[in-house]
Amino acid sequence: MISDNARSGMQQAPARSLFNALGFTAEEMKKPMIGIVSSYNEIVPGHMNIDKIVNAVKLGVAEAGGVPVVFPAIAVCDGIAMGHVGMKYSLVTRDLIADSTECMAIAHQFDGLVMVPNCDKNVPGLLMAAARLNLPTVFVSGGPMLAGHVKGKKRSLSSMFEAVGSYAAGTMTEEDVLEFEEKVCPTCGSCSGMYTANSMNCLTEALGMGLRGNGTIPAVYSERIKLAKHAGMAVMDMVNKGITARDIITKDSIMNALTVDMALGCSTNSMLHLPAIAHEIGFDFDIKFANPISEKTPNLCHLAPAGPTYMEDLNEAGGVYAVMKELADIGLLNTDCLTVSGKTIGECIATAYNRDPEVIRTVDNAYSKTGGLAVLSGNLAPDGSVVKRSAVVPEMLVHEGPARVFDSEEDAIAAIKGGKIVEGDVVVIRYEGPKGGPGMREMLNPTSAIAGMGLGSSVALITDGRFSGASRGASIGHVSPEAAVGGPIALVEEGDIISIDIPGLKLELKVSDEELAARKAKWQPREPKVTTGYLKRYASLVTSGNRGAILKSSADE
């Protein structure tokens, strides 16, 4: 066992004295030691139940003959961090989580790990760590929140943000906003739509790193406690069989996850996280891989914010495996990929079926023949940009309009709420990329303000920042190269005409090459927005959005 390095032989007698201090028995020191990475805290609604999930995992590990040992991982609530300086500290935690988990796992020589994440950066950070460490590893998330109910309709956090925009437009009263505030988030769990957290938990299941139901069983269901116990048992089975994370996280399983992403209509943030996970196994994942996958993958689900259904509905309809069964039946998945259950994807989904074609549409009745995401390129985004095509209204799939240019999120919000943005405009928010932000803030407040003010079907937003999974509309993010490194988005001037062609996968600035070259010759880098602390270090190491905003391993890279 790996843990023998820390516990066996006369040389490790001092370490054993410390295990004795922890209360380990002599019998426990002979059993596999399983690290349980707990993301529990009291500031993230999606993590406030994780202590209960962790306790269930511990029971499962012990039942199967292992010794469970809990250690922590940090987690940020993107909703609470939204709209202020705190959002600069969200994406950056992904790599902190991966790095700190690596340190804990290797320092203490665990034989296996159970990751218990739930929210946005916590899930991909731990997936990166799992791929890097290559230990027997199982994921079990905290689970999604139930939808709220306002005036007889299901609602979620995205409708809360849009309510603020409606209030600014004068179409909603303060009392109406208060009712949303009190009712849209009724339980613990990751916010109830197909936002980033739930997207990544579903893709964890598609990758094979979580058991059936990992992405969809609601946080408050007792079924999730059972799932956690089974996760503890499953990691012991992996230890006994010698199955490790890289047996499961492979190029093929990542492409499976990308295919499921397209069918589910996941958050655009998956186009940051899948490349980062792939990087950990040495797979150079180009975000432009998304387009050929999207071209042949039907979009089967329109969960909030794209439609009126929620994670609890997807769970009742058969969950991720039911979606995967639809895709496998038309040959779009590699069903030979291994899962943490010890079975292949094909074996796992063999008994899955679609219980509600209104929630999971059949291939014959798909929302569209193409997938939920698209990568657009052109002279405004030579290295690509990402849009959630499934959340764009038909009239905005092709659009041309004048640029309204802002060098920060705050300036853009002030203009939108001040009535300075009109139908046809293309809002450009730049210097918000991984390096320029720094931290690549989510532009949920601007997109929600646009939607709430009734401009969602006539105004587009383009940024080198990113979007919450709760954003909808013609919201094009991850524009690469970013403004801070002199990308073309830095050269856009007020009134320039921008052409968006989502079906054609094009994002163009209607300015001549000669004019762009002249502007580039005059361009000067901005002074860093942050000159101290972790963000300074992050800005010096982070790569572009099209590379997953991974960190360089050296200054020369």
Swiss-Prot record:
One of its GO terms (molecular function) is magnesium ion binding. Its cofactor is [2Fe-2S] cluster; Mg(2+). Keywords: 2Fe-2S, Amino-acid biosynthesis, Branched-chain amino acid biosynthesis, Iron, Iron-sulfur, Lyase, Magnesium, Metal-binding. GO terms for cellular component: cytosol. Pathway: Amino-acid biosynthesis; L-isoleucine biosynthesis; L-isoleucine from 2-oxobutanoate: step 3/4; Amino-acid biosynthesis; L-valine biosynthesis; L-valine from pyruvate: step 3/4. Its EC number is 4.2.1.9. The modification N6-carboxylysine is found at K121. InterPro entries: Dihydro-acid_dehy_C, DihydroxyA_deHydtase, DiOHA_6PGluconate_deHydtase_CS, ILV_EDD_C, ILV_EDD_N, IlvD/EDD_N. It catalyses: (2R)-2,3-dihydroxy-3-methylbutanoate = 3-methyl-2-oxobutanoate + H2O; (2R,3R)-2,3-dihydroxy-3-methylpentanoate = (S)-3-methyl-2-oxopentanoate + H2O. [2Fe-2S] cluster binds at C119, C191. Belongs to the IlvD/Edd family. Homodimer. This is Dihydroxy-acid dehydratase. It comes from Lachnospira eligens (strain ATCC 27750 / DSM 3376 / VPI C15-48 / C15-B4) (Eubacterium eligens). The lineage of its organism: Bacteria, Bacillati, Bacillota, Clostridia, Lachnospirales. The gene is ilvD.
